[in-house]
Structure formats: structure tokens, C-alpha cells
């Protein structure tokens, strides 16, 4: 008899078929308490869980006594109670490598669109404001040869550094938990403390996961240390930034502009002051949102669940020690 798994995110037909070759698959719309209650017997028997954008906490795990592995279609897993999973010896799988290049593309797009005011001036053209030769009020700022500060030199940080160094001749500063020898050798990146990075960078790109240590890592103190001409980019996790402090820094002119793919609350409220600022490019968490990459992430998550329930945790496992 095939193991039972719960799928709470739609999959392409071929990937659903692959999953069904290994498991009895039960599809649900979400992991809300109402859904769990209505499908209590299914949740009680499930050995696997696959999906994204839902919280997996201790309360849910209490309803799933046979759960052995959960697979998220994402690289981030801050919506999972890792301690609760680990305490119950439940494997947590994620998709860390598939989206690297695509998210780096998004970061570079935010750098370019904020610096060159692409969104703002495009809207002005559509509004009929381009009636003569443009003047300084249409101008942006250069990207090439400007200093890029990267906070978080992981896979995505490395991919961004490659684009910035080889594509735009940008000097690279970085701050991370440890020195990154490859970044220093390939991109001539210079490790520095966070204060130095903030003071010297023309663009500050934040690429950090959300943890207890990184929550509100960027606040009023950090923005005050940046150049008034600096542009802030965040495509990591929204709550790493104190959004009210960011809004205040933009309103006071402490920083020049911001390109944001993530926010403290998502979707972003239509009443957010960020949406009324011409110097803010706000996009709806599109970091990995291409057809190719989202398919690749889903395929990776399917394979991860198959591997996990077969005891294979050599890659893409957040807590592999629980399999010991």
C-alpha cells in the first residue's frame, strides 16, 4: 500500500502524476483549522506533506501523528516550526538551489529600476507628460561602477555579485556570518562589518532569511548610517526590515530610494505609505516568479518528498539529523 501524502498546492499535471506513482495523494485547498477538521481522517493518516505559503506549526502536527516528512516549494521556511518538526523527527525539505539565478535577476532588476526610475518615468509617459525633450526631473542615477553592498553572501548573493561585478563593473562589499573566500577571489569582494558597508555602499542589497536574529535587523539606526544618495533593496524576507523605520528614512531623505520585493505583511496594504512614494519600486514577492523557475521548484519539492520518505536526506534537508 502506498504511503498517504497531502498536497496543499496545485501542481502541473506531470508532477502530480509523478507524485501519484509513489503515494496516495490527497489534495486540499489549504492548511486552515477548518480544512484540517473537515479532513481529519486524511490528516491523521498522512506520512507526507507538500505545498507552500501555509503555516506548519505544532498545532497542525498534533493532528498528523504519522507525518514523517514535509516538503516546501520554497527556499525559505520561516513559516515552519522547525523545532516542533525536529522534536517529532519529521524531516523538512526545501528548494534552495533551483531559484538562485532567477532571484538574482530580480535583485538586479530592482537595482536598475530604482536607480534609473524606470517604473516612475514609464508611468509619466503613459500619463502624457512626455511633451518635449526631457530635463533633469526625468534623470536617474548611474549603476555602473557604483559600490554594491550585499548583506548575506549565500548562493543568491554570489549570483548577484557575479552580475554586478562582470556586468556593471561594480565594486562589491559584503557582510555575512563568515568570510567567503570564493566571493573574494572571483569578484574581488571585500568583507566588512555592517556599519562600514552601510556607510560606503551606493546600493545596499539585503538577502537574508528570517530568523530570531535577523528580525528587524534593519531599523532606524541602520538607515541613518547609509548615504543620503543610497538605494536600499530587499528581496530576502520582509520582517528583516522595520518597515516603519524604512518609511521614515525615505520620508526624511535619509536614503534616496528603495526597491522592495518583500514586506512585513503580505500582501502589502493598499494604504501603505510606500505605495505613494515615487522613489519606491514595490513588486509582489516575484523573486522566483518565472514559469521556468516555479516549475523547477515544484519538481524539486516533489523529488524531495519522494527522497525523504525513502530515507534519502543527502540534499535539500533542513534537519537531516532527525533521520539518524
Swiss-Prot record:
Keyword NADP: yes
Subunit structure: Homodimer.
Cellular localisation: Cytoplasm
Gene Ontology cellular-component annotations: cytosol; plasma membrane
Domain of life: Bacteria
Signal peptide as annotated in the record: none
Entry keywords, A to Z: Cytoplasm, NAD, NADP, Oxidoreductase
Active site location: 237, 266, 285
Family affiliation: Belongs to the D-isomer specific 2-hydroxyacid dehydrogenase family. GhrB subfamily.
Task of the protein: Catalyzes the NADPH-dependent reduction of glyoxylate and hydroxypyruvate into glycolate and glycerate, respectively.
EC id: 1.1.1.79, 1.1.1.81
GO MF annotations, alphabetized: glyoxylate reductase (NADPH) activity; hydroxypyruvate reductase (NADH) activity; hydroxypyruvate reductase (NADPH) activity; NAD binding
Taxonomy of the source species: Bacteria, Pseudomonadati, Pseudomonadota, Gammaproteobacteria, Enterobacterales
Coiled coil, from the record: none
Name the UniProt record assigns to this protein: Glyoxylate/hydroxypyruvate reductase B
Catalysed transformations (reactions): glycolate + NADP(+) = glyoxylate + NADPH + H(+); (R)-glycerate + NAD(+) = 3-hydroxypyruvate + NADH + H(+); (R)-glycerate + NADP(+) = 3-hydroxypyruvate + NADPH + H(+)
Amino acid at each position: 500500500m502506498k504511503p498517504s501524502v497531502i498536497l496543499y498546492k496545485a501542481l502541473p499535471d506531470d508532477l502530480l502524476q509523478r507524485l501519484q506513482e509513489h503515494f496516495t495523494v490527497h489534495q486540499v485547498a489549504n492548511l486552515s483549522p477548518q480544512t484540517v477538521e473537515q479532513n481529519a481522517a486524511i490528516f491523521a493518516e498522512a506520512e507526507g506533506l507538500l505545498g507552500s505559503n501555509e503555516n506548519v506549526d505544532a498545532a497542525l502536527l498534533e493532528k498528523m501523528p504519522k507525518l514523517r516528512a514535509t516538503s516546501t516549494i520554497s527556499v525559505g521556511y520561516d513559516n515552519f516550526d522547525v523545532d516542533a518538526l525536529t522534536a517529532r523527527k519529521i524531516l523538512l525539505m526545501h528548494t534552495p538551489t533551483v531559484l538562485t539565478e532567477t532571484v538574482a535577476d530580480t535583485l538586479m532588476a530592482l537595482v536598475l529600476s530604482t536607480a534609473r526610475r524606470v517604473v516612475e518615468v514609464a508611468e509619466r509617459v503613459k500619463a502624457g507628460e512626455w511633451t518635449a525633450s526631457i530635463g533633469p526631473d526625468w534623470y536617474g542615477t548611474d549603476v555602473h561602477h557604483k559600490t554594491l553592498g550585499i548583506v548575506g553572501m549565500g548562493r543568491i548573493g554570489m549570483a548577484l555579485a557575479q552580475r554586478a561585478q562582470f556586468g556593471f563593473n561594480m565594486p562589491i562589499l559584503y557582510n555575512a556570518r563568515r568570510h567567503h573566500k570564493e566571493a573574494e577571489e572571483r569578484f574581488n569582494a571585500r568583507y566588512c562589518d555592517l556599519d562600514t558597508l552601510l556607510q560606503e555602499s551606493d546600493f545596499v542589497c539585503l538577502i537574508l532569511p528570517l530568523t530570531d536574529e535577523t528580525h528587524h535587523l534593519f531599523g532606524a539606526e541602520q538607515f541613518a548610517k547609509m548615504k543620503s544618495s543610497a538605494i536600499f533593496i530587499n528581496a530576502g524576507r520582509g520582517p528583516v526590515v522595520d518597515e516603519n523605520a524604512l518609511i521614515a528614512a525615505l520620508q526624511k531623505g535619509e536614503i534616496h530610494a528603495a526597491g522592495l520585493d518583500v514586506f512585513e505583511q503580505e500582501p502589502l496594504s493598499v494604504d501603505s505609505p510606500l505605495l505613494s512614494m515615487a522613489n519606491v519600486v514595490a513588486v509582489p514577492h516575484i523573486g522566483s516568479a518565472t514559469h521556468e523557475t516555479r516549475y523547477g521548484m515544484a519538481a524539486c519539492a516533489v523529488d524531495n518528498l519522494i527522497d525523504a520518505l525513502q530515507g534519502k536526506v543527502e540534499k535539500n534537508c533542513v534537519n537531516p539529523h532527525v533521520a539518524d
